[in-house]
Amino acid sequence: MAIRRVMHVDLDAFFVSVEQSLRPELKSKPVIVGGKPERRGVVAAASYEARKFGIHSGMPLLSAKHLCPQAVFIEGNHRLYREYSEKFMQILSDFSPFLEPMGLDEAYLEVTGFESLHGSIGEMALKIRRRITAELSINASIGIANSKVVAKIATERAKPNGQCEVPAGEEAAFLAPLDISIMPGIGKKTEYHLKSLGINTLGRLAGIPATFLKIHLGTYAPYLLNAAAGIDNRPVEMPAEAKSISRETTFETDTRNHTFLEAKLGYLSEKIAATLRKRGKQARVVQIKIRFADFTTLTRQKHLNHPCSGNQEIFQTALKLMNGILDSDRRSVRLLGVGISDFCGPEKQLEIDPARARLEKLDASLDKIRQKYGFGSVQTGRTYKLKDLF
């Protein structure tokens, strides 16, 4: 029986690397993607040069500015990042059909038995990295091991722009000296709790009696014990199709401006509707989410009389839900979101409503233009108002 080999591929500082590939003058500089530091927001990605100042993803932009005043702050272009991600996944799929994407910038590959095609799995990893660099002008790091969890940790040890292979049978020895914080699934709270018990390394964690660990971590304990010993039998698999589509945005300042909220709701509705149509689906449920300035969050949903995928139908339903909340609540809004769910195939209509048919034709035309020139290339009168309100 062939020895199992799993590869974890991770693009280094992905958002920043994309920006640097298009703007060479940014290379070797501290670069932060996330927006302007004076705006309310967080760091989405930081270059390795910026990380030397203690900057990390999720940090408030203003804090990052204080740590590194000379950093270059970039708004970011998520449409561009998705395009790069699609090319990245296509490159990986050329090497193995057993591909499990994990977000835009990383994926697992099942590569057991692929030695005969590439000489060795290490050579295969090198080919992948070289092709990514050649075609995307960004670097990738790769970890190789007998399981997903060990391969991912190996990737962390390989960064940046390197590769690390853990030989079969040496997983426990590889993991033993490493700090528990490197283990996927151990967050800050669990790390603090384990270290308060004197458990600082994965080797120490692997040797803790299961009964003792279960008292402190509950049902999560068996997984952690196995993972710390390099045991992880999870398969590499394509993710199931998402059961919902949603978009939300946090505002720079809390607002009660209804014109602004309606325009933003229209924009979010058009984005999720376009994604739904791209999948060839319709939705039966529309939901909105509102978070107020005091962080209280309310959600409301509506089951539609018939499934739809149109911009106008989704927006009008979401608008009624939003107004139903705001008409009776005068608090300022911090976050607004809209979602759709309960998908089905296109509905067969015995009688076609002319008005609905015209809207469907309009949506299809918008989709074609936006796919070619970008979502902002054409706007409705409602969303165009956002330009005057930002």
Curated annotation (Swiss-Prot):
Binds 2 magnesium ions per subunit. The record marks F15 as: Substrate discrimination. GO terms for molecular function: damaged DNA binding; DNA-directed DNA polymerase activity; magnesium ion binding. Its EC number is 2.7.7.7. GO terms for cellular component: cytosol. Poorly processive, error-prone DNA polymerase involved in untargeted mutagenesis. Copies undamaged DNA at stalled replication forks, which arise in vivo from mismatched or misaligned primer ends. These misaligned primers can be extended by PolIV. Exhibits no 3'-5' exonuclease (proofreading) activity. May be involved in translesional synthesis, in conjunction with the beta clamp from PolIII. This is DNA polymerase IV. It comes from Dehalococcoides mccartyi (strain ATCC BAA-2266 / KCTC 15142 / 195).
